[in-house]
Every structure is written in C-alpha cells, then in structure tokens.
C-alpha cells in the first residue's frame, strides 16, 4: 500500500491523501458472505442519542468475517484481497478445499494464491491460525481470542500487531500493541503475522465531506455552547473553562482520570499495564 498525495487544485484537495489500493485484487464482494445492516445514527431503541456525532454516511453491506478460524486441517487458497468499508484492515477471500468460502483479515504480506490453514500443527507463517500453546516465543500475531472458541477480539485494526513472550503453563504471555503485557489462556487461538494495510493511519481526510461519508457528524466545542449544554459554556466572548480542569458534557473530569475498573476480574491477568498507565 502506498499513500497518494493530491495536487492542491481545490481547498478540499490541498491536504487530502488516500490509499492507492494496490493490494486490492477484486472489486465486487462475495455475495454469499454479505449481510444487510442498518444504521441507527447513534440512537437507542427509545430514540435517545447514546453516541454523539453519528449519522448519515454511505450505505454498506456487512462482510461476514471468520474470526474463529476453527476449520482445522483443511487447507484454503487465497483467491482475492478485498476492501472492507466496515474496518480499517483489508480482507482476504479464502476458498477451502471442501468448497467452503470465507473471509479473514488480510495479514501483511499475504498474496493471492497463498495457502493457509488452521490447527495446532499448522506452519508458522502469515495467515495460519494456531492455539497460543503451539506458537513459539517472539512470534508476531493478531486476531487473538480472549475465550477459547469465541473468536478473535484483540489486535484486529490495520497495522496492529502483538507478540508472544512465552508460555506459562495454562497461560501464554502476550505483549499487545499498547505495550500491555497480559496472560491469555493457551487454548485460545491467534493468527500469525501483523494486520495489513499498515499505512492506514497516515491517511488525511482533507475535507469535512469525507468524514460525512464515513457517518461522522460535526463536533462542537463545549466553550461555544450555552452553560445549560456544557460545563465550559457561557461567559462573554472567549471565556476560559472556569473550573480546576476540563470537564465532559456530563460534568465529569475529562483528563487524567482512569476509566478502567480496578476490581475487574481480568485485572489479575494483566502483568504490566499499557504505557499510558505507568
């Protein structure tokens, strides 16, 4: 993947960049692996806004991704690398030897024609899925399960990667993208390699319209609101916050406050917290 920079022919193009989509080999998705999805614009079943700044955006079909990778000892050939509008990573279309088709997250370096498989005896190469107990220390992994058989939940965004540090009996030590080191059950599965499309974070939208295509609505600063709408609102002209520290719209401190529950049961599985929480 390479980043395309545009000539400043308009104000919207001046700082715009995009992907060249060189890795994409197929434009139309596999129809049997599509589902319709409706968007709620950040509203719940009562019609109340529960997530602000959501709404609009282009219609999208959901691609059914195989996060479980539990089809053991059946080899599959990579038939295409496709774009997925629902995630930052690209996806790979697999054709299994028994006729089944499936989508997986496309790891970095996976090419059309490559053969991938799952199971404890699979080779250590990008795209193969194994239990953590069968993955040697130092191996880069992604799409990591937290509960055996539930499907990958960790390290699924474009360019992310985790590393196996070693096996400790029932658990395997894994260093995540954030720097956190935690124990994960050795029977949980993970996929070898890092997630592809690693330059996605370098893309600049360049104009407000591209945010609207993605379903993101404008966000107003609290300081330009009325005092009944935000703790920062009110005052004459450009008034300061007027409080010891910035607040959320609901009156809670917004900086330096830990949001993780210190009594969570998974706390005992974390060996070292992420870099921001030293």
Curated annotation (Swiss-Prot):
HAMAP family: Ribosomal_uL2_B. Residues 210-219, 252-263 have a biased composition (Basic residues). It holds the Pfam family Ribosomal_L2_C. GO terms for cellular component: large ribosomal subunit. SUPFAM superfamilies: Nucleic acid-binding proteins, Translation proteins SH3-like domain. This is Large ribosomal subunit protein uL2. Keywords: Ribonucleoprotein, Ribosomal protein, RNA-binding, rRNA-binding. Gene3D superfamilies: 2.30.30.30, Nucleic acid-binding proteins (2.40.50.140), Ribosomal protein L2, domain 3 (4.10.950.10). The keyword RNA-binding applies. The gene is rplB. Part of the 50S ribosomal subunit. Forms a bridge to the 30S subunit in the 70S ribosome. Belongs to the universal ribosomal protein uL2 family. One of the primary rRNA binding proteins. Required for association of the 30S and 50S subunits to form the 70S ribosome, for tRNA binding and peptide bond formation. It has been suggested to have peptidyltransferase activity; this is somewhat controversial. Makes several contacts with the 16S rRNA in the 70S ribosome.
């Amino acid at each position: 993947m390479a980043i395309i920079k545009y000539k400043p022919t308009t104000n919207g193009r001046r700082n715009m960049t995009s992907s060249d989509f060189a890795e994409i080999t197929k434009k139309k998705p596999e129809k049997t692996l599509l589902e319709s999805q409706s968007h709620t614009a950040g509203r719940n079943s009562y019609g109340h806004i529960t997530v602000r700044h959501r709404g609009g955006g282009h219609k999208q079909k959901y691609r059914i991704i195989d996060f479980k990778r539990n089809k053991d000892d059946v080899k599959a050939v990579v038939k295409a690398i496709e774009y997925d509008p629902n995630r930052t990573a690209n996806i790979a279309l697999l054709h299994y030897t028994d006729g089944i088709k499936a989508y997986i997250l496309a790891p970095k370096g996976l090419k059309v024609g490559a053969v991938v498989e799952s199971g404890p005896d699979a080779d250590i190469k990008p795209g193969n899925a194994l239990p953590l107990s069968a993955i040697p220390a130092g191996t880069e992994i992604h799409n990591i399960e937290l509960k055996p058989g539930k499907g990958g939940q960790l390290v699924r965004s474009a360019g992310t990667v985790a590393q196996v540090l070693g096996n400790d009996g029932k658990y395997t030590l894994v260093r995540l993208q954030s720097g956190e080191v935690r124990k994960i059950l050795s029977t949980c599965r993970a996929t070898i390699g890092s997630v592809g499309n690693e330059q996605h974070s370098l893309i600049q939208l360049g104009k407000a319209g591209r945010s609207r295509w993605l379903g993101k609505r404008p966000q107003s600063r609290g300081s330009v609101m009325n005092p009944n709408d935000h703790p920062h609102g009110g005052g004459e002209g450009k008034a300061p916050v007027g409080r010891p520290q910035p607040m959320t719209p609901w009156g809670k401190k917004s900086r330096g406050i830990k949001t993780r529950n210190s009594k969570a049961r998974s706390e005992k599985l974390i060996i070292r917290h992420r870099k921001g929480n030293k």
